[in-house]
Amino acid sequence: VVAEAPARGAVFIVTTERCPQILCRLLGLIAQQDRLVARADAVDTRRVLRVMLAVPDIDRNRATIIAGKMRQLVRVRTVKVRIDK
């Protein structure tokens, strides 16, 4: 019996200022790396927007590149990345 290799992936947790365009910009950065988002969640707290994006089948290098680009967006305050091995 051959065991399947565990799926790699990353979860991005992003805190931003409230901005109508930020979700499209975050998703666009992931699309530029030719990846799809498996799950997304956004919570508006009236002060900030908290966004969670789960991206399967992505390696650590690409996830790091995306996180760096997210941090460069003007409205983004924090970016945390959890890499699943």
Go through each PLM region and give its residues.
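A conserved regulatory-domain signal marking ACT and ACT-like small-molecule sensing domains
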Residues: V1-K85
